[in-house]
Amino acid sequence: MGLPVHNQPHKAHSGSPASTFSAALVSSAISNVIGYPLDSIKVRQQTYNFPTIRSCFQNAVKNEGLKGLYRGLTLPLISATLSRSVSFTVYDSLKLTFAHVDPTLRYFISGLGTGTFISLFACPFEYSKLYSQIDMLLRKTNMGRRQETNSKLSVRPPLSSFQSASDIVRRYGFTALWNGYRYHLTRDALGSACYFTIYETFKKNLIANDVKPHFAYAFSGAFCGALSWILVFPVDTAKSIVQRNTLLSIKTPLSSIPWLSFTIYRGIGISLMRSALINSCNFTLFELFRETKVLSK
């Protein structure tokens, strides 16, 4: 985020909105390409009963090949990259607006507002991504209900993320792209609030204790990504279940979601790996670009 650390020997560069946006754009694109296969495995574990990360990975590779783990990358990459760029820019602006507030509360409020704003635009992209990622599994489920053979799976090739969005609109209507939005909103608002607060606090304390800035960025990014994800993971699982069931024409009452069951955390292992990796990479690159102003030249 390139936020200033007051009264410390190391000075972070806050920069202009344009420099914030461009630095976040490039760093987010790189980190999301690196972490996408882990996200694909996470979604499969959340929506179908794979007992381990290994079994989920083996199933995906066996049925779809390694490229299957990158299926649906285009649309969420655009979404994640743009939303991260906008969110960092919005966050910096909100932080200035609440400059008179206690630092920790300022980080939390600014993150909360950022997540709320971004969720409105990110939901259709994420829903299309989920649709694309579990398309093969959905067809197996539907064919099993109709007692059809798996050989018919080869009739239609897997959908891309753009094809998924088009298919959702064609079959369910334009507003269907926001199915499960209340869960998405809750996840993004609370997640962003925790995310930015944890990152800012840890980064500031590490640098204050003479930790090298780049290590502070990497560690704080990994830690904020993992911890904030643990806090909102049940909501993310509920979102995936609701969206999957909508595609299967199954109603999902709030009481039917296993909030107090360990199954709500299915896929948490791969999610923590992904979140730590992506955010460590993202914040390190972001802060580096902001400090060197390499993208402004």
Swiss-Prot record:
Recorded GO MF terms: L-ornithine transmembrane transporter activity; transmembrane transporter activity
Predominant localisation class: mitochondrion
Protein keywords: Membrane, Mitochondrion, Mitochondrion inner membrane, Repeat, Transmembrane, Transmembrane helix, Transport
Taxonomic superkingdom: Eukaryota
Entries under InterPro entries matching the protein: Mitochondrial_Carrier, Mitochondrial_sb/sol_carrier, Mt_carrier_dom_sf
Function of the molecule: Required for arginine biosynthesis. Transports ornithine synthesized from glutamate in the mitochondrial matrix to the cytosol, where it is converted to arginine.
Protein name per UniProt: Mitochondrial ornithine transporter 1
Organism: Schizosaccharomyces pombe (strain 972 / ATCC 24843)
